[in-house]
């Protein structure tokens, strides 16, 4: 079972944006728990079995070298990360506005929720339902997170105990054109 004090501490850290999955996620859901599961980190340089629609996410994850220079320090975990601020379309670096005008979604394959928490890095626009990361259960959005109108990805997390054992998908959404019309994601645990 989850220690109430540890849970409250982790919840406060999520709200402050300083949740650390390497440390905080090690709160086991039961004595037989094997610890965190890295669901996706994109370190093979592809989206794998994720379904990409539209033009926002390009053909694969970006690196610090291939993202727009003006996005500054996005703080990914590892080399590759998801970023819908698509400057890859023509081989040129378009203006910030045109890169933010690309729309699309990226949806994971189905998976079974096996732990009490899901954490990830997220950055980009702070527009609910428009630039967000969603947890889908039975095809419906049950939890959602946005960036903070900042390209620097911060760790956030969801308490998913309610859906433990359920099949789910993670969906990254970019439905917004213009300033902060982008979303970044990395290291889903």
Predicted regions and their residues:
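Extracellular/lumenal ectodomain signal focusing on beta-strand-rich modules
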Residues: 16, 41-44, 84, 110, ...
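Extracellular beta-strand-rich recognition modules
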Residues: 42, 117-124, 168-174
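Short carbohydrate-recognition loop motifs
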Residues: 66-100
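Extracellular carbohydrate-recognition regions
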Residues: 1-65
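Extracellular carbohydrate recognition and processing domains
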Residues: 135-183
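Extracellular polysaccharide-targeting segments
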Residues: 32-33, 38-41, 176-189
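Extended, low-complexity, turn-rich repeat/linker tracts enriched in Gly/Pro/Ser/Thr and Asp/Glu
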Residues: 114, 121-132, 177-180
């Amino acid at each position: 079972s989850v220690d109430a004090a540890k849970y409250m501490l982790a919840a406060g850290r999520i709200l402050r944006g300083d949740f650390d999955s390497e440390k905080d996620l090690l709160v086991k859901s039961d004595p037989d728990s094997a610890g965190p599961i890295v669901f996706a980190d994109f370190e093979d340089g592809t989206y794998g079995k994720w379904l990409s629609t539209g033009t926002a996410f390009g053909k694969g994850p970006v690196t610090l070298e291939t993202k727009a220079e003006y996005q500054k320090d996005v703080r990914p975990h590892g080399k590759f990360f998801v970023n819908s601020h698509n400057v890859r379309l023509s081989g040129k670096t378009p203006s910030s506005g045109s890169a933010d005008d690309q729309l699309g979604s990226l949806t994971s394959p189905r998976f079974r929720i096996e732990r009490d928490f899901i954490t990830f890095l997220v950055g980009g626009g702070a527009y609910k339902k428009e630039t967000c990361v969603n947890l889908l259960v039975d095809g419906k959005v049950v939890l959602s997170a946005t960036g903070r109108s900042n390209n620097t990805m911060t760790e956030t997390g969801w308490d998913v105990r309610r859906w433990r054992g359920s099949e789910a998908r993670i969906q990254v959404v970019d439905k917004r054109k213009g300033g902060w019309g982008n979303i970044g994601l990395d290291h889903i645990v």
